[in-house]
Amino acid sequence: MIKEISPAEVQEKLQNGENIELIDVREDEEVAEGIISKAKHIKMGDIPARAGELDKEKEYIFICRSGRRSENVAAFLQEQGYKVVNMTGGMLEWKGETVPKQ
């Protein structure tokens, strides 16, 4: 079972200054339209090769367009022993600010 969080809950955590780890797994052209400012971009296809960059002691919130790809990534990483949360509804439901990808 994958833990879930709503976009509104993520926005609230950011507004409260909580130190949360966000990973956006969308493709480059999707992220070019805007990304949550604190999110790190790792494309879904790159996750297996880049999982070593993640700390198993931290909890990561995964984001995609609708919540489906991020759920798959979260399930994959949970099996590897990572602490994961899926942002349900994805960027389609995100009402907060986005910034251009750096």
What do these predicted ranges mean?
Residues 1-20, 27-59, 68-102:
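Rhodanese-like catalytic fold shared by cysteine-dependent sulfurtransferases
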Residues 63:
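Short, surface-exposed ligand- or partner-binding patches at beta-edge/loop junctions that are enriched
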